[in-house]
């Protein structure tokens, strides 16, 4: 699928399998989400620009590379996205964090905003939106639209599992925003959940129902 990168790495596949298993405990699920998010972050940042600097090692001078370009913001969609943001911060601890509160109306399945807090200079940063599940796609579409209204132009979306419908919906609304995911599942059920998916990522992360 154009604009979609499926991170097909043995560690990612292994961790995702354990997350899909309904017998996996809340503690283990939370840890696996964090670990998998770190691996996905490694891939989504693969093409970051760098520049050459001169440094002194303990044994002599050398030229080496540092990251250049825009500073990063991780923007988890509350609440499930928080578990992924932690794993990404493990890899890029200097990144800022925005919070986007959206819930899915159980009848219309449309996204409803209830909270939005970002760094003041977010328009000047690379923003990576994170949400474990890209199901109907409505929540991701709404979150990205909200960020664009704040002036953000450099956006990426990262999830654990996407549905075909979710990918199509997000790409249709925001064709300029690339997607990274660990898997793409074929179906949604009548409640808008991905099948086979991994259940409600927020409930499984925080031990709620």
Curated annotation (Swiss-Prot):
PANTHER family: ADENINE PHOSPHORIBOSYLTRANSFERASE, URACIL PHOSPHORIBOSYLTRANSFERASE, CHLOROPLASTIC. Allosterically activated by GTP. The keyword Transferase applies. This is Uracil phosphoribosyltransferase. Pathway: Pyrimidine metabolism; UMP biosynthesis via salvage pathway; UMP from uracil: step 1/1. Uracil binds at residues 194, 199-201. One of its GO terms (biological process) is uracil salvage. Keywords: Allosteric enzyme, Glycosyltransferase, GTP-binding, Magnesium, Nucleotide-binding, Transferase. One of its GO terms (molecular function) is uracil phosphoribosyltransferase activity. Catalyzes the conversion of uracil and 5-phospho-alpha-D-ribose 1-diphosphate (PRPP) to UMP and diphosphate. Signal peptide: none annotated. 5-phospho-alpha-D-ribose 1-diphosphate binds at residues 79, 104, 131-139, 200. InterPro entries: PRibTrfase_dom (IPR000836), PRTase-like (IPR029057), Upp_B (IPR034332), UPRTase/APRTase (IPR050054), Ura_phspho_trans (IPR005765). Its EC number is 2.4.2.9. It is an enzyme of class 2 (transferase). It comes from Caulobacter sp. (strain K31). It catalyses: UMP + diphosphate = 5-phospho-alpha-D-ribose 1-diphosphate + uracil. Belongs to the UPRTase family. Coiled coil: none annotated. Its cofactor is Mg(2+). Binds 1 Mg(2+) ion per subunit. The magnesium is bound as Mg-PRPP.
């Amino acid at each position: 699928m154009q604009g979609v990168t499926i991170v097909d790495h043995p560690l990612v596949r292994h961790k995702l399998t354990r997350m899909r298993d309904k017998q996996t405990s809340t503690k283990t699920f939370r840890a696996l989400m964090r670990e998998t998010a770190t691996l996905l972050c490694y891939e989504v940042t693969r093409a970051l620009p760098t520049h050459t600097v001169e440094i002194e090692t303990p044994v002599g001078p050398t030229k080496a590379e540092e990251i250049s370009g825009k500073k990063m913001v991780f923007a988890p969609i509350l609440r499930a996205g928080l578990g992924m943001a932690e794993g990404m911060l493990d890899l890029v601890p200097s990144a800022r964090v925005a919070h986007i509160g959206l819930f899915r109306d159980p009848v219309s399945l449309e996204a409803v905003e209830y909270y939005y807090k970002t760094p003041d200079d977010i328009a000047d940063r690379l923003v990576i939106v994170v949400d474990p599940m890209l199901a109907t796609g409505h929540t991701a579409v709404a979150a990205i639209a909200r960020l664009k209204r704040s002036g953000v132009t450099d956006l990426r979306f990262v999830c654990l599992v996407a549905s075909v419908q979710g990918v199509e919906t997000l790409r249709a609304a925001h064709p300029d925003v690339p997607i990274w995911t660990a898997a793409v599942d074929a179906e949604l059920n009548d409640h808008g959940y991905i099948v086979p998916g991994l259940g409600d990522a927020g409930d499984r992360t925080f031990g709620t129902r």
